[in-house]
């Protein structure tokens, strides 16, 4: 299964149904090793063998054993008849530059490709490749049984289909771990979702079935699960900050190297025309009576930071109060507060959760950070204590006056 994205931003989930072959010497040959995959020997299922590597794969072929490598240069006749890179629903025509007997890895020239085969493959297959001469033509054909893939401009493979026609799919992985997933709602809206896991005391994760149920709750009628575990990461660039920040909690402790990812980018440019305010922190969780300082950053019509004017603050729904400087004080009851900053023409909103009764309160020694369950002090002795509260394993913002 995979998810595809079209040029207009719409998405779909389907099996790719790909068929990949190369034609040369009057014969079409299945590309059993695929495109831009590590070269492997052909197995009993006829997977592996002849492999095409473009410069998108790496700087080198990364082969570790001897084999036959054919350096190919794509043909661009200027008419658009052939694609210059492998494309579903199109053919790419190459001209042979060199045929090499390689002992291992070789460079992949920029803008070119390498057709490669392990020296342990059948003599017939090796002879067919060795018969190629500089100037010969090799034609790559990539097709799919699902024509939608011919229109997709981006795609990413997944491990399981989670939701079909608004129903949870069968045969899903029942292990609890971290999972990233992508869902599509009936109106075409795409949801990017991540569940942290493998961290007892914070989040043990979820089964694929539970992730599917959650995506259905969010309105998804189709959904796919990507590879889970420690690679599960969501990062964003906030309007008032530079560079991407990881906003979930990867189980490896930090973001790790991934071979596949989806990046959402914008072609918008700064306009300098004030349109709204970005209120931070926008999703705080406070213990009743706690305070948090809010700030409002001006955003232009393209969501880039820009100069704003003086703003007034108000709580438009929920409990709590906010003063003229943006200092919010949580109310006495649990609930959700919507805090608005406005200059009369542009505005922005932040959302704050108030918890009246925490699940746990802990005490620590202010100086050492050590947990305190009991105290033995000499007469007149003093120790500074720090109280902390949590709700559903989430730390609550609180001050000493809250306890």
Give residue ranges: language-model regions.
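Gly/Ser/Thr/Pro-rich low-complexity, intrinsically disordered segments
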Residues: 1-402
């Amino acid at each position: 299964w995979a998810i595809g994205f079209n040029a207009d931003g719409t998405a779909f989930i389907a099996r790719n149904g790909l068929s990949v072959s190369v034609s040369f010497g009057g014969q079409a040959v299945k590309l059993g090793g695929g495109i831009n995959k590590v070269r492997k020997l052909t197995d009993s299922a006829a997977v592996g063998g002849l492999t095409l590597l473009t410069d998108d794969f790496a700087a080198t072929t990364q082969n570790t054993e001897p084999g036959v490598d054919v350096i190919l240069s794509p043909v661009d006749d200027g008419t658009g008849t052939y694609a210059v890179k492998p494309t579903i629903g199109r053919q790419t025509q190459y001209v042979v530059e060199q045929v090499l007997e390689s002992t291992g890895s070789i460079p992949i020239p920029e803008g070119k490709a390498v057709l490669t085969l392990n020296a342990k493959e059948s003599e017939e297959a090796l002879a067919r490749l060795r018969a190629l001469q500089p100037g010969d033509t090799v034609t790559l054909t990539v097709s799919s049984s699902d024509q939608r893939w011919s229109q997709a401009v981006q795609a990413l493979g997944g491990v399981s289909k989670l939701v079909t026609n608004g129903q949870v799919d069968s045969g899903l992985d029942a292990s609890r771990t971290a999972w990233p997933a992508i869902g599509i709602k009936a109106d075409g809206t795409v949801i990017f979702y991540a569940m942290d896991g493998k961290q007892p005391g914070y989040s043990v994760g979820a089964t694929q079935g539970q992730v599917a149920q959650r995506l259905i709750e969010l309105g998804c009628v189709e959904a796919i699960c990507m590879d889970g575990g420690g690679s599960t990461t969501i990062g964003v660039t906030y309007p008032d900050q530079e560079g991407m920040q990881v906003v979930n909690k990867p189980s490896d402790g930090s973001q790790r190297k991934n071979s596949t990812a989806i990046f959402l980018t914008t072609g918008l440019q700064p306009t300098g025309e004030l349109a709204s305010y970005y209120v931070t922190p926008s999703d705080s969780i406070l213990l009743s009576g706690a305070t948090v300082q809010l700030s409002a950053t001006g955003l232009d019509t393209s969501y880039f930071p820009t100069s704003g004017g003086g703003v007034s603050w108000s709580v438009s729904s929920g409990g709590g109060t906010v003063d003229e400087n943006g200092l919010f004080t949580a109310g006495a009851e649990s609930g959700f507060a919507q805090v608005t900053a406005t200059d009369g023409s542009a505005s922005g909103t932040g959302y704050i959760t108030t918890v009246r009764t925490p699940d746990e309160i802990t005490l620590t020694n202010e100086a050492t950070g050590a947990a305190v369950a009991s105290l033995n002090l000499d007469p007149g002795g003093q120790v500074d204590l720090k109280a902390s509260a949590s709700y559903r394993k989430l730390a609550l913002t609180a001050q000493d006056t809250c306890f």
